[in-house]
Amino acid sequence: MTSITFISDTHNQASSLRLEPGDILCHTGDMTNFGTGPELKYFEDWFASQTQFKHKICIAGNHDKGLDYRNGKTPFKFTDSSITYLCDQAVELEGIKFYGTPWVNEYGPWAFGLHSYELYYRFGLIPDNTQVLLTHTPPKKILDYCPEQDIYIGSEELLDVVKLRPNLVCHAFGHCHEHSGRYLGAHDITFINSSNGNTQTIFL
């Protein structure tokens, strides 16, 4: 079996994590606080140093502004060959089909925010053969409750798409710091929120 370890929302604190060896390490966004070049380079160096994993995948989150190609500046590029960065892209590793997408509901001056109709388009690109889905936002009402504001911050558009993907086994995300953990949902999909250093591992 293949082990897949998930982390998210490390916000420049990734070096505080002590990760057990495994096959694939996935980071589901908000690697930084503001997405500056130095912050992203710091994360790249740390991520590349996790040589106890055979493969490493990451996607951006709303704090990772330097990766948003729409901001009028040349986006940061991960140059370390051991890192696979996904932005509306798929990759197959150890025979498992991954897809990564960073988009979130638009709010404030943050990165990768889209209106509802745009989210339906972006999430509609998720291939039917995807087995492990990496997003930054949770789907609506799945590990996305923020008690201070008494709201669910997940994406209804994402939920509508996820439940139509017939081969999906695991959906990992972050974004909501207050509700990390895992949940076995409909169609035996394992949903994982690994924000705030709450490392989660599955075996496929």
Range-by-range predicted roles:
Residues 11, 17-19, 110-129, 135, ...:
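Active-site-proximal loop/helix segments of hydrolase catalytic cores
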Residues 32, 107, 129-167:
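Active-site-proximal segments of metal-dependent phosphoesterases and phosphodiesterases across multiple
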Residues 11, 32, 62-64, 102-104, ...:
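Catalytic metal-binding/acid-base residues of hydrolase active sites
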Residues 90-94, 157-165, 170, 177-204:
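Binuclear metal-dependent phosphoesterase catalytic core
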Residues 77-121:
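Hydrophobic, well-structured mid-protein blocks that either form specific transmembrane helices
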Residues 7-93, 164:
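Core catalytic region of metal-dependent phosphoesterases/phosphodiesterases
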Residues 2-11, 26-28, 95-104, 131-136, ...:
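Active-site-proximal beta-strand elements of phosphoester/diester hydrolases
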Residues 40-44, 74-76, 115-120, 148-159:
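Charged helix-capping and loop-helix junction motifs
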